Each structure stands twice: as structure tokens, then as C-alpha cells.
Amino acid sequence: MDPLRIAVLLPHLGVYGGIRRFLELGAVWTRRGHDVLIATPRSATAREAWLPFAGRTGDVERVPEERWDVLLSPDPDLFRSVSVPGALRAFYAVLEKAPRARAAWSVADLVFGNSAGMVRHLRRRGVRAVAAPGGVNLERFHPPAADVRRARARAGGPVRALVYGRLSRRRKGSLTAARAVEAASRRSGVPVELTLFDAPPPGSRPAGEGEGMDLGIRIPHRWVLRPTQEELASLYGDADLFVSAERRAGWCNTAAEAMACGAAVVCTRSGTEDFARDGFTAHVSRWPWAWSLARRMTPLLRDPALRARVAEAGREKIGEFTWERTADLLERGIRERLEGREHAAKAS
């Protein structure tokens, strides 16, 4: 097959899970010999890729100067503002109820959804979306070589819980997750040590820095701010439990990464339906409320063997979701639409 020319339009290259997705995909496509450009506006606050990326980066404003097979973007405003004659316009929906997303769907040649939940959300609104679930970099995120979690459980020490601490975004549910950990510890009588981590955008001041923010919880807790990728993998690999209370997520990167590193996951259904099967690969709360999450967490605190079984099943399941697989699904959808357009042109 001929290489594809793919222009990815992003609002910035800052430290966000949604940006990770396209840096990972761009790296896969570049290794496969495709011509990939990740383009951001000249006015973007973060224009340096925060993950290693061997492909091209450049200006959104200059994208129309080249020939492209496809323009791919998750950002409704950028997607609508850029067009190139002959290029397929593919919108990648990554967030439920994203502002102005409906306007992007209406002009797209092709719409992808980044999870089963997102595809269902789109189809309820009359959009024929193609499923392209997210992935995990399994070379980076895996259990530590010397995994001490089972030995630590046998010794009877506190359970270590981990929460993504992006308090500035309420839909992430970070405060709800922290309160759920406290409630489950109190209900089960099992001591818990909680770690919250965040890599806030430039110019913002996260909770946990300076005077921080009072979480209103009375269990031991600490913040880890701006961890490197190696430090993040280490945090996941040290956690007995990872707790997520997200709402309106497309694909929950943090839950997937924690699962890949061998943590037992307690989560909502938001962004996790593809890999979190309740009672098997994770404990899933029906509602994004602290009491509901605490109820699903309590058995895992009380029973280390159950916690280990769920963690192992989760790690096996998430191993199916590589970025190479996601790249395959996107590439297949793009090629099928390009071929269909070519056949239609010949027939007319």
C-alpha cells in the first residue's frame, strides 16, 4: 500500500492525555513510513511535543500549502477552520458534549469515536461513527520488574491508592475519587495511603502547590506534581488501587495506564467500557459518586487476593489495546473512505 500523507491538527502540544494520543499515533505512523505532520496554531501556548516524536511538527496556518490525503483532528474549531482540496476530513471525537462538536460532525467526511461509549454517544445523535478505541504504550507502562505489592499485602501494611489529581477539571472527578478512597477505608477498617498526581498546564497553579487546597479528607495523602513519564510509571507500578471518577470521558488514559502497570482499577463507566468489565478486570461504579465508588472499592481493600486477581485480569485485558491497534483502526477507516470516494468518482 502507498504511504499516507496525514496532517493532524491540534490546539497545542501540552501535557494532556488527548495530546498523548496523537503523539503516540503519529510515532506509529511515522515508523510505518507515512508522512505525518502534527500541526498547531502559531498562537498555541505549548508547541514543543512533551513526548518523543520523530515526525514533523509545524504550523496549522501552513497546512494548506501541501497536499494531504487526510486532515485528522479532535478539535472542532481547528477542524472547521482548515481545509485542503482533495483531502479527506476526519474528525476524531474524544470528549462527550464537546463545545461545537456537532458543527464539526456536519462537515466531516469521516467521524471516529475513541471508545465504545463515545461511539454510542455519537450514534444516538445520528452520527455514523467508526470505533477507534484508545491505547496504551506497553513498553512504557507495565508492572515493575520487582513488584512488591503482594509481599506488602502479606505483611499487612496500608493499601496504597492512586488518583489523578486534576482538580481544575471537575469532570475528571478527582475530589470525588479522593473522598471515595477515604470512605472505603473508613467502611472497611483498612488503612490507606493516598497519592494524587498532576501535571498542570503552564501558567496554572495546581492544588498541592504552595498553600494548595484542603481536600477535606482525613487519611494520609500526598501530592506528586509534574512527574516524568518514568516517575508516572513508577507511581502506577507501586499502587495497589487506582481510582477514577471521570464523567464525560472519551478514553480514560490514566485508568488504562494504571491497569497496564498492575494496579487494580476502581472506576466509573466513563471512558473505560472497552477494558473495564465489572467484577473481572475492574470494579466499576454505576454512578460517579463517592459513596458508590467506595462500595465497589471496599471488597478490594478487604481481600488482597481478590485485588490481585482483578489486577492480573485487568493487565491481561488492557494488553489488547496498543497504540499500534488504534493506528490500524484509524488507517483502515481512512483507506476505506478514500477508496470509496475514488470508486464513486470513477463511476460518475
Which residues are covered by each model-predicted region?
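Donor nucleotide-sugar binding/catalytic pocket of nucleotide-sugar-dependent glycosyltransferases
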Residues: D109-P144
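Conserved donor-binding/catalytic core segment of Leloir-type glycosyltransferases
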Residues: R152-K172, A178-E182
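Nucleotide-activated donor-binding/catalytic signature segment of Leloir-type glycosyltransferases, i.e.
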Residues: A207-E230
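Short alpha-helical donor nucleotide-sugar binding micro-motif in glycosyltransferases
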Residues: S234-A239
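Aromatic "clamp/platform" in nucleotide-sugar-dependent glycosyltransferases that forms part
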Residues: R247
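Short hydrophobic beta-strand element within catalytic cores of glycosyltransferases
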Residues: A264-C267
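Conserved acidic donor-binding segment of nucleotide-sugar-dependent glycosyltransferases
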Residues: D278-A290, P299-P304
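A short, well-ordered alpha-helix in the C-terminal region of glycosyltransferases
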Residues: P299, L306-E320, R332
